[in-house]
């Protein structure tokens, strides 16, 4: 993805520029999102407008988990001290939704935890219903959904869990 390459390698976040404030940080970047914001684990059956039975496959969380296991095996970053979980455009939803999972399961010893969400805000009264019944997201995700603002719910839950030890 060209935009991810520019962001990470050409003067962006993980730049080799001497004065980069992000030098030596480990980063998890979500450049975009799956239809379930990387949080689904199941199938949703429905009938389309022509009366045909259809299935939506929501495997974002399953795929994310497999990818993270492979990344952790290959990258040698399991002892990272400073970590940034970030996403832009629809990837910001993935960053906000999965940051707790990332810090709990992959970087539990990081002392400098950071989450930066860019451009992922949408008000929708049925986030909880969608996450539970359509995407079949894990309860570790759905239990944090309290309002019509999914991103803010996730960020609030991070603040409640980590307090001042996480930078949002």
Short names for language-model regions:
Residues 1-2, 33, 77, 89, ...:
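Functionally engaged cysteine thiol sites
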Residues 29-34, 87-90, 119-121:
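Short, flexible loop/turn elements at secondary-structure junctions
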Residues 88-99:
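Glycine-rich nucleophile elbow surrounding the catalytic serine of serine-hydrolase chemistry
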């Amino acid at each position: 993805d060209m935009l991810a390459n520019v962001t990470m390698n050409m003067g962006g976040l993980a730049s080799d520029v001497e004065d980069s404030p992000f030098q030596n940080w480990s980063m998890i970047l979500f450049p975009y999102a799956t239809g379930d914001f990387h949080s689904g684990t199941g199938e949703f059956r429905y009938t389309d407008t022509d009366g045909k039975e259809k299935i939506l496959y929501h495997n974002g969380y399953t795929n994310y988990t497999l990818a993270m296991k492979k990344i952790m095996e290959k990258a040698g970053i399991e002892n990272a001290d400073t970590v940034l979980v970030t996403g832009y455009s629809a990837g910001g939803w993935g960053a906000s939704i999965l940051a707790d999972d990332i810090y709990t399961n992959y970087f539990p010893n990081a002392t400098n935890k950071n989450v930066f969400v860019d451009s992922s805000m949408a008000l929708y009264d049925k986030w909880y219903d969608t996450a539970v019944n359509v995407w079949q997201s894990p309860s570790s995700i759905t239990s944090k959904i309290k309002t019509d603002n999914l991103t803010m719910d996730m960020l609030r839950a991070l603040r409640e869990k980590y307090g001042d030890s996480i930078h949002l």
